[in-house]
Amino acid sequence: VNVPEPVCFVAPAGHPLADKAEVPLDVLAQQEFLLTERGMSYRDALDQRLAARGLSIHPYIELGSASLLCQMVERGMGLSFLPEYIVRPALSAGRIARLNVPDCTVTMHRQLFYHKDKWLTPQMKAFIELVNQ
């Protein structure tokens, strides 16, 4: 199983950047950020893309919980860079806005490996189905 998972920049609804058609990466790097801890795959991907352009983001909060970061963005505490599956409900409800940053797109991959010739229990089949959603 190999499912692409986009990662996106998000801002609180009503943030000045939320209405912009595009946000340049250098403008974004000047904002207050809430990010996941270093070592998480999508955080590392962001840091690498920023470094390649001579930029960096110095978050004022780093947490291990992407869900909690999304809630903090909803409450207007800053911007973040999170997997789309985490922010989708808040985006749909209009509580946060996805920022269009064309010079920094990141897609991670949700992967699950299993032996194709081995018998799969009903629980394993259900788990594979869940990962594919």
Residue ranges and their predicted role:
Residues 1-8, 93-106:
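Short beta-strand->loop
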Residues 1-33, 122:
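Flexible hinge/capping segments at coil-to-helix
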Residues 8-10, 16, 79, 97, ...:
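Residues embedded in well-ordered beta-strands
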Residues 13, 84-86, 103, 110:
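Short secondary-structure boundary segments
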Residues 17-18, 32-53, 120-124, 128-129:
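Secondary-structure junction motif
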Residues 19, 99-133:
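A late-sequence structural motif
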Residues 39-99:
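Hydrophobic hinge/microswitch elements
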